[in-house]
């Protein structure tokens, strides 16, 4: 019974994070768990997600 309860708690807590992923954010970026190598971090979204924008920072 405990494993089933743990699964339900995990799914309940994970749902808000999934709703925030791939949302548009600052400077037309996208919220992700981690930016790709070809993207730069410009801000943070909710739940410690990173707001990623394509391209490299200006020198």
Curated annotation (Swiss-Prot):
Task: Give the primary localization class.
Answer: secreted
Q: Its biological function?
A: Has antibacterial activity.
Q: Which family does it belong to?
A: Belongs to the beta-defensin family.
Keywords in alphabetical order, please: Antibiotic, Antimicrobial, Defensin, Disulfide bond, Secreted, Signal
Please name the InterPro entries in this protein's record.
Beta_defensin_dom
Organism whose genome encodes this protein:
Pan troglodytes
In terms of superkingdom, the source organism counts as: Eukaryota
Q: Which Pfam families match?
A: Defensin_beta_2
UniProt record, GO biological process: defense response to bacterium; innate immune response
Q: Which cysteines are joined by disulfide bonds?
A: 25-51, 31-45, 35-52
Give the signal sequence positions. 1-19
Mind telling me what this protein is named? Answer: Beta-defensin 134
Recorded GO CC terms: extracellular region
- List where in the cell it is found: Secreted
């Amino acid at each position: 019974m405990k494993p089933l309860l743990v699964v339900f708690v995990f799914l309940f807590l994970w749902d808000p994070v999934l709703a925030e992923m791939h949302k548009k954010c600052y400077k037309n970026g996208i919220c992700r768990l981690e930016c790709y190598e070809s993207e730069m971090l410009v801000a943070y979204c909710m739940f410690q997600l990173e707001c990623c924008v394509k391209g490299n920072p200006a020198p």
